[in-house]
Amino acid sequence: LKLQLHDERDRFVSRRIREEGIWEPFETSLVLASLSPGAVFVDVGANIGYFTVLAADRVGDSGGVFAFEPDPENFFLLQANLNLNGVQRQVEAVRAALSDEEGEGGLYLSEDNLGDHQIYSAGEVRERIPVPLVKGGEYLQDRVERLDLLKVDTQGSEYRVMSGLMPLLRGLPMVPRILIELTPLSLQEAGSSGRALIELLATLSQPFWIVDHIEHRLVASSEAELARWCDNVDAVAGDRGFMNILVGSEVNFV
């Protein structure tokens, strides 16, 4: 894996990859274990393309990857990294933010965490740039016949992303695994809530798993447990507690 990274301004994703050669090791193994040649992967909030490139290499020429990233600087590096790794043919990269509506939105930029841009204002002083908003379900409807893994990491707009994708997911022959970030405070700032996201995901009737990236394991959970956790986080003002969760069948690590 060869990646063109952000400069020292980015204290998170690029810095970690520069220092350790990997980003989110357990999530990386989850993505790779969920994909095989011919599979289809959708990366929502693709950043500079770390997971996109890994997935494209995994699914090969017979598979497909769709990567959505609204920030122009991240998107430039995403495209550069596709070319650098020779996987541009199997990736459709789209400079847009997925949402539950079409049109134009604002992306509020973080100066030191270039993976923490948000499509809502949380009251901080941030530069705002216009970005296209796209309904994921409508965009992908005629482009995919199957979907194996969906990764959503959008700094609080996960509910709107999933709302826009639900018509597609419900119409597929098989519901994909979904790897998604759950940050109740960010979801609230974006006009939703952690509980609302969990209840929406539960309509897919798939198992829930907590991604334990410390012990590198999946911990079985439930709609009720995760909704309760969200309520507990909401009860503490300013609590930015978060976790990644997996929705779908258990992953077989080989």
Predicted regions and their residues:
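Conserved acidic-Pro-Pro-aromatic motif
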Residues: 138-253
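Short helix-capping segments at alpha-helix termini
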Residues: 60-61, 84-88, 117, 169-175
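Short, well-ordered alpha-helical scaffold segments within catalytic/effector domains
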Residues: 24-32, 130-137, 159-162
